[in-house]
Amino acid sequence: MKRTYQPSKTRRARTHGFLVRMKTRGGRRVLNARRAKGRKRLGL
């Protein structure tokens, strides 16, 4: 059985990237929460 995590930079960016977060209201909430917490990296 193969492992479930098969890394791909493109897929990672398309699902968890900054632009994707900015698209939806919920995603913007995620970014604002991370800003408030003081995260160094917000999206990908």
From Swiss-Prot:
GO CC annotations on file: ribonucleoprotein complex; ribosome
**InterPro entries annotated for this entry?**
Ribosomal_bL34, Ribosomal_bL34_CS
The answer to keyword Ribonucleoprotein applying to this record is yes
Matching PANTHER family: LARGE RIBOSOMAL SUBUNIT PROTEIN BL34M, MITOCHONDRIAL RIBOSOMAL PROTEIN 34 FAMILY MEMBER
The record's listing under Pfam families reads: Ribosomal_L34
The transmembrane residues are none
* Protein origin, superkingdom: Bacteria
- What molecular functions are annotated in GO for this chain? structural constituent of ribosome
HAMAP family named among the record's database cross-references: Ribosomal_bL34
Q: Which family does it belong to?
A: Belongs to the bacterial ribosomal protein bL34 family.
Protein name, UniProt field: Large ribosomal subunit protein bL34
